[in-house]
């Protein structure tokens, strides 16, 4: 029957893990981010303005996982990211020539998390306002004016932020305005490393515009993936991971026909066999890892009572 045929086809494709094609194409701008399926299962995703170009299943956003994703993709001119853990260490190793644009919206959110959207202290009101101004900067003159205003804020409130208070519980001195100090230090790191305004560098923009935010992947891809998972509540962790893999695959530039997918893509059995091999043999070194962290694949089928990570 037709229903039986549909179920057979569905079951057959559920056993497949679609892989990202390795094209060797060099992109001007690449966006990267991760979407968590559980506390320690995340799918890292890379895309351009037009297509998804890579994905990788991992335990966490550590440098090893990011390097595995990035190793499949030639270094782009610019990568737009939210500054997740482990990314910079991996970028230095795998994409050493790639410039970084830190998402300005995430930079603003990091400040807002410390000051709240209704800060009580005048220093917090001013810093929150400066962080909010980041979202509207579109030209070099505005960026220079912002840097000057931020430098003036740091000088104006330097003594205030240097105040310390004795913590009665620990007996140690701590910053009196600790949340403001944290917000300032975060912005200081972005400014000192020139990560906020890469999108305005004329040497880079001559090859095409560079977005200042990670909206393409956070709002354009992750939001759709979360909606898909909500619409299909009840899927096992394995099938949620596969659903994301399939969504990413059909949004690559040229997905293979169904017949070719069945011939070339790895199945659950293939990965089980690979995991058995790497459990007894050393890791291969002839190219980038293709599918995901070995422990992730194992835990999708057999939960382990302990946690292991690499970085």
Per-range role (PLM):
Residues 52-80:
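Active-site beta-loop-alpha junctions of metal-dependent nucleic acid enzymes
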Residues 2-9:
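Short, small-residue-biased leader/transition segments that mark boundaries at the very start
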Residues 10-24:
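Short, basic alpha-helical nucleic acid-contact segments in DNA-binding proteins
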Residues 47-49, 69-74, 91-102:
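Short, surface-exposed basic-aromatic patches at helix termini and helix-loop junctions that form
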Residues 24-37:
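Two-metal-ion RNase H-like nuclease active-site motif
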Residues 33, 82-131:
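Conserved beta-strand -> loop -> alpha-helix junction used to position metal-binding or nucleic-acid-contacting
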Residues 81-84, 88, 129-311:
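Acidic/histidine-rich catalytic cores and adjacent linkers
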Residues 33, 46, 50, 79-82, ...:
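Mobile genetic element proteins and their domesticated derivatives, centered on retroelements
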């Amino acid at each position: 029957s037709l229903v039986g045929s549909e179920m057979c086809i569905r079951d057959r494709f559920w056993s497949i893990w679609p892989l990202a094609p390795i094209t060797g194409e060099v992109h001007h701008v690449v966006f990267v981010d991760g979407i968590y399926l559980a506390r320690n299962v995340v799918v890292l995703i890379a895309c351009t303005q037009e297509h998804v170009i890579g994905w990788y299943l991992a335990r966490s956003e550590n440098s090893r996982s990011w390097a595995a994703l990035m190793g499949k993709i030639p270094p782009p001119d610019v990568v737009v990211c939210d500054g997740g853990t482990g990314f910079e260490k991996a970028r230095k190793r795998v994409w050493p020539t790639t410039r970084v644009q830190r998402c300005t919206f995430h930079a603003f959110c990091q400040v807002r998390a410390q000051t709240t959207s209704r800060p009580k202290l005048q220093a917090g009101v001013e810093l929150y306002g400066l962080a909010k101004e980041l979202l509207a900067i579109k030209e070099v003159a505005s960026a220079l004016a912002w840097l000057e205003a931020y430098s003036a804020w740091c000088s104006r409130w330097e003594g205030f932020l240097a105040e310390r208070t004795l913590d009665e519980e620990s007996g140690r001195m701590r910053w009196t305005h600790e949340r403001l100090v944290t917000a300032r230090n975060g912005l200081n790191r972005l400014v000192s490393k020139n990560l906020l305004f890469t999108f305005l560098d004329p040497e880079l923009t001559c090859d095409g515009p560079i977005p200042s935010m990670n909206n393409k992947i956070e709002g354009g891809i992750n939001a759709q993936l979360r909606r898909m998972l909500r619409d299909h509540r009840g899927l096992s962790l394995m099938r949620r991971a596969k659903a994301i893999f399939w969504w990413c695959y059909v949004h690559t530039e040229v997905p293979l026909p169904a017949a070719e997918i069945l011939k070339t893509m790895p199945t659950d059995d293939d990965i089980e066999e690979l995991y058995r091999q790497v459990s007894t043999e050393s890791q291969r070194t002839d190219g980038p890892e293709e599918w995901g962290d070995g422990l992730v694949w194992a835990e999708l089928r057999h939960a382990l009572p302990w946690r292991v990570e690499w970085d």
